[in-house]
A protein has these predicted regions:
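Conserved active-site regions of diverse hydrolases
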Residues: 1-370
């Protein structure tokens, strides 16, 4: 499995390049408090994994939005030079890793791309940009144009890999950005009809981010269908991360499965926003610090990091990464590409053992795959 992606997949490559962040209590350069999903997938399946992901990478090349100020443009350009794009990761792989830029075992190697979130959340710190971006989705500075550009580029990345010989390809959609702790942390977004009530502002931000996520996922699904028809001999899997995160939240899916069945204690970090007839329950982040803060202060880490859903404002915990690996692995197994994974109860016990060992300093020396 050859992977291209961003901080949701980065296994320490950005920190290896910068030698700076993320600092502890981030785990060995990961944007989480423990291993990230490709590492769990390797442990549970024995599948060979080659990971090219860099934290901060975007799906498309940075492009200034109309009306964006100098600070916003400089921020996007800076992020591009530090983290690059998925296209640069693929070009580097084709030029430096392969002989003559050709994939020799395209039928026994899968190529996975997971990106897009940075194309959108990079706008969040910028007050004017994020407001126009979300409030005017149809406008030239609105999110629909950015989604179209990101999804178009993701399709081009698949075509590049196919042209080099890849035949088994995996795309992943996005979890609901409107349910991440970034909604609780944000101070920059201003609704169209300004409310003095900050709760109403956050509810509107959550709604807009959820709309953006659904639009991205719909456009990506359409793009994947077109690619399947366009690329003869290809097998393309679309992993529905959005639906899977809904299950982890206890929304939809199997009504007999609740978050605690996955090992979560969501009540501990739950925050319910209520305004007039609107209500939404979100999860607070477990770690209240920043990438470059680095502190041994236990007070800024939640008391149950092994049972939390989100580590920081946008990144999942080690436990959530473990379940994301289970989702990806099961989709690969259903396609007949790898052997079946263990049943959910067995896998849960394995996940919890590893996560507790990493996050709580368990004394166990080894953890065998289930």
């Amino acid at each position: 499995l050859v992977i291209f992606g961003d901080s949701l997949t980065d296994t320490g490559r950005l920190k290896e390049r910068l030698k700076i962040f993320p600092l502890a209590p981030y785990w060995i350069g990961r944007f989480s408090n423990g291993p990230v999903w490709p590492e769990y997938l390797f442990m549970v399946t024995g599948l060979g994994v080659q990971n090219h992901a860099y934290g901060g990478a975007s799906a498309a090349d940075p492009e200034a939005l109309p009306g964006e100020n100098f600070y916003g443009r400089a921020r996007h350009v800076g992020q591009f030079f530090v983290s690059g794009t998925i296209g640069l990761q693929i070009s580097d792989y084709l030029e430096r890793t392969l002989k003559d830029g050709k994939i020799e075992r395209g039928d026994t190697t899968a190529f996975l791309i997971w990106a897009g979130a940075n194309d959108y959340i990079s706008k969040e710190p910028l007050r004017g940009t994020i407001t126009t971006f979300l409030n005017s989705p149809e406008g030239e500075a609105g999110y629909k144009a950015v989604v179209e550009r990101a999804v178009t580029q993701l399709g081009q990345h698949v075509r590049s890999l196919y042209a080099a010989g890849a035949r088994r390809l995996v795309m992943m959609n996005l979890p609901d950005l409107g349910r991440t702790p970034i909604v609780l942390q944000n101070t920059t977004y201003v609704p169209e009809h300004l409310e003095s009530n900050d709760t109403a502002r956050r509810l509107e931000l959550a709604r807009r981010l959820s709309e953006l996520t659904r639009y991205h996922n719909q456009r990506l699904a359409t793009a994947v269908e077109k690619l399947r028809a366009e690329l003869p001999g290809s097998e393309i899997i679309l992993v529905d991360v959005y639906e899977y995160f809904e299950r982890l939240y206890g929304i939809g899916g199997n009504p007999l499965l609740q978050p605690e069945d996955f090992g979560y204690d969501l009540a501990a970090l739950a925050v319910t926003l209520s305004f007039e007839e609107q209500q939404l329950t979100l999860q607070r982040r477990c770690y209240d610090g920043s990438y470059d803060q680095g502190t041994p202060d236990p007070d800024i880490v939640c008391p149950n990091p092994d049972q939390a859903l989100f580590w920081d404002s946008v990144h999942p915990t080690a436990l959530t990464h473990c379940w994301n690996a289970y989702k990806v692995g099961n989709d690969l197994a259903e396609a007949g590409w790898i052997r079946p994974l263990p049943d959910q109860r067995t896998y849960r016990g394995w996940c919890q053992t590893i996560v507790k060992r990493v996050t709580l300093g368990s004394a166990e020396d080894t953890v065998s795959a289930p």
